[in-house]
Amino acid sequence: MSLAKAKEIVSGNPVAVFSKTYCPFCVSVKDLLSKLGATFKAVELDSEKDGSEIQAALAEWTGQRTVPNVFIGRKHIGGCDATTALHREGKLLPLLTEAGAIAKTSTA
């Protein structure tokens, strides 16, 4: 059930961040996405009644037990380090745009 819920969240949003409210790495990722103007769904696992089950299901699905657990365009990206590395490499913005999390701007 929890895995199905996680997959539904991932498939229903251009960007999904499984997070915990007290996690500084989660805050960093959400701040970065916000600064880039990305639309994302944050699921605060410590506020969800089935949060620990969702986290366990995510670990089984992705092999990652920690938060944040970031998905862009239905693809597992990883955590804070992976997300910020993509940004440093100039690859995050194109991924977000391709996923539909950032509106494409017209140059006309």
UniProtKB/Swiss-Prot annotation:
Function: Has a glutathione-disulfide oxidoreductase activity in the presence of NADPH and glutathione reductase. Reduces low molecular weight disulfides and proteins.
Alphabetized PANTHER family for the sequence: GLUTAREDOXIN 2 (PTHR45694), GLUTAREDOXIN-C2 (PTHR45694:SF14)
Cellular localization per UniProt: Cytoplasm
GO MF annotation terms: glutathione disulfide oxidoreductase activity
Disulphides: 23-26
The keyword Endoplasmic reticulum belongs to this UniProt entry's keyword annotation: no
Keyword GTP-binding: no
InterPro entries: GLR_AS, Glutaredoxin, Glutaredoxin_euk/vir, Glutaredoxin_subgr, Thioredoxin-like_sf
GO BP annotations listed: cellular response to oxidative stress
GO cellular component: cytoplasm
Stated name of the protein: Glutaredoxin
Entry keyword set: Cytoplasm, Disulfide bond, Electron transport, Redox-active center, Transport
Family label: Belongs to the glutaredoxin family. CPYC subfamily.
Domain of life: Eukaryota
NCBIfam families in UniProt: GRX_euk (TIGR02180)
Domain Glutaredoxin stretches: 3-103
